[in-house]
Regions:
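Active-site-proximal substrate-binding core of FAD-dependent oxidoreductases
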Residues: 10, 245-257
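Glycine- and acidic
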Residues: 67-68, 133-141, 219-224, 257
């Protein structure tokens, strides 16, 4: 628990356990990876259990959820506003070298633990390109670009909610590099695959939760549930247990705590 897995152990085409980064080994009858899909397949399993379809999925050609996020604490009660608002911009804005035509604004007033009465936590989201941030990561340009993105987004937020810029008390920026660093998600993808014409068939047909040539192993999470979201990722865990019960000839039964 709370320890990173280095390798998934296998023997004779069967998953047998995991080795942690502290060299501890934990054996198991079944292994379920809810970790990053690319890291699971190509790092923890060394790419030994793939086929052409899987390699194509993870060759970088399919779009993924790559976002810039600006979070802020404001001295304003936003509870009467829509929880999530997508603003279509009259004029495109240039962020991280690309034009963007919309801005997502979300507040968290439904969770009173996040801010004291009369104040709010706001999150602003805009799509971006991982490769751009990767090129400048570790250089002074990276910090400068983060600040510029934040300034531009706040400027447009003030147009939607006049005067809110003066109410901002705290700002924090996150790029795909932030997501990659803190969550381990490949290319900093926040919700796995981005739903487009290319990836819609994956959502309709489903992404296999098992890997070719490897038994007693399943994947769960947004990399096997195109479209992402916490709800889909959580449901994939339940679906995985159903599949294991079926293979063991056991009845899957749920109960309320």
């Amino acid at each position: 628990y709370k320890t990173q897995v280095e390798k998934i152990l296998t023997a004779n085409g069967r998953a047998t356990g995991v080795r942690l980064y502290n060299d501890e080994i934990h054996n198991a009858n079944w292994i379920i990876s809810a970790a990053d899909g690319h890291g699971t397949i190509f790092d923890m399993l060394d790419g030994e259990y793939t086929n052409r379809k899987i390699r194509k999925m993870y060759d970088g050609s399919l779009p993924t959820h790559q976002m810039c996020q600006v979070s802020m604490g404001v001295n304003r009660d936003m509870s009467a506003e829509p929880h999530w608002l997508t603003v279509l911009l009259d004029e495109p804005i240039l962020l991280a070298g690309e034009e963007r035509h919309e801005l997502g604004i979300k507040h968290y007033c439904f969770d009173t633990s996040l801010a004291p009465p009369g104040k709010s936590v706001i999150e602003l989201i805009v799509r971006t390109n991982y490769a751009y941030w990767q090129r400048i990561y570790g250089r002074r340009t990276y910090d400068t670009e983060q600040s510029q993105v934040s300034d531009i987004i706040i400027e447009h937020l003030d147009k939607v909610h006049p005067g809110i810029e003066a109410d901002i008390e705290f700002v924090d920026e996150a790029t795909p590099m932030s997501y990659e660093h803190y969550t381990g998600n490949w290319m900093g993808a926040t919700s796995g695959w981005l739903l487009t014409g290319k990836t819609m068939p994956m959502m309709i047909m489903g992404v296999p939760k098992q890997l070719p040539g490897l038994s007693n192993f399943y994947m769960a999470g947004h990399w096997v549930e195109p479209g992402g979201t916490v709800t889909l990722a959580a449901a994939s865990g339940k679906n995985t247990i159903q599949l294991i019960c079926s293979s063991d000839g056991k009845y899957f039964e749920t109960s309320l705590p």
